[in-house]
């Protein structure tokens, strides 16, 4: 059985990156929540 986590920086950025978050309404909500919480890093 292969391991489920096969790291790829491109895939990571495209699904969890800042521009991906900004693309949808819910993604922007995620960023605003993280800003409100005071996260040092908003996205990957």
Swiss-Prot record:
GO terms for cellular component: ribonucleoprotein complex; ribosome. One of its GO terms (molecular function) is structural constituent of ribosome. The keyword Nucleus does not apply. Keywords: Ribonucleoprotein, Ribosomal protein. GO terms for biological process: translation. Belongs to the bacterial ribosomal protein bL34 family. This is Large ribosomal subunit protein bL34. The gene is rpmH.
